[in-house]
Amino acid sequence: MTSDKTLNNLIAYLDNPHPTVEQAIEVFTPLTVGDYDDVHIAALLATIRTRGETYADIAGAAKAFLAAGRPFPITGAGLMDSAGTGGDGANTINVTTAASLVAAAGGVKMVKCGNRSVSSKSGSADVLEALNIPLDLNPDRAVRQFNASNFTFLFAPAYNPAVAHVQPVRKALKVPTLFNTLGPILAPARPEFQVMGVANPKLGQIIAEVFRELGRSHALVVHGSGTDEIAVHGPTTVWELRDGEISTYTITPEEIGINRYELSELAGGDGVENAHLMRETFASRGPAAHRDAISATAGAMFYTANHVPTIAEGVAKAQTMLADGSVERWLAIHEEANYAE
């Protein structure tokens, strides 16, 4: 049962259009331990959706849920995570997941947190499972996988179990909520580097500020012409956090060394189909649009991890790796590996 103090804090928060991070932490912490009734959770999520997500909402909720979560055994310096908010309705191939594998094959320390499909036909877990990348490993085996390959995948529910308290209400509301934004931010590895796509460009600056609050040293938040990816069909807005400073700029496909394509050329299917398309790209047989879209995001990852001085040079590195078979060989080594010992 919700205590009077907790309920009074919640009511005050709902009436406050400009909450502080500390107030948000105070309101979201009871949510992490199941202290709210469903009606209270619905009121909180609906109010935030109606007035618009603020920096305090996102930063405070992130801090509350990270404090309640289970960190990955390896955290911090040198690690990267990558994900998007989803919700752009594009149903493309799994660009970010494919780019994460390219980045790992190229030396980026990638600890990717994700889940099965929610708003698309194929979530990151769906396509990785179809690629025979071992999933749902216990932490010790996941560490062995990471040490062997520069890559591991962490199921979000296993590391952020407190989110389960919200799921029934999220499903009942049937609209995007704060937790669509929070998902990629609640990275169990507490990474130093992050690339995150947002379907709603109004959130770009806010999320960059949240990453600064959470201690990221270098992060990119991107919105590409209506999608939560770096676009091959138009310009992409980038909010870049580097050493505490945030800059905003626009990049075009031509500026980073790729061609333009129609968004429809990136249309994807379910996990099995997208895995097949990914293998074709890794083997240099896939459509040029797929190669360039994956290279654009992988290039941003190489740049964010400070492996190259510009995104364009990162794109060139990714394209070279796809052309010479480096990624295909990496996948052949690491798919179906056991990591039991």
UniProtKB/Swiss-Prot annotation:
Its cofactor is Mg(2+). GO terms for molecular function: anthranilate phosphoribosyltransferase activity; magnesium ion binding. Keywords: Amino-acid biosynthesis, Aromatic amino acid biosynthesis, Glycosyltransferase, Magnesium, Metal-binding, Transferase, Tryptophan biosynthesis. Mg(2+) 2 binds at residues 228-229. It comes from the Bacteria. It is an enzyme of class 2 (transferase). This is Anthranilate phosphoribosyltransferase. The gene is trpD.
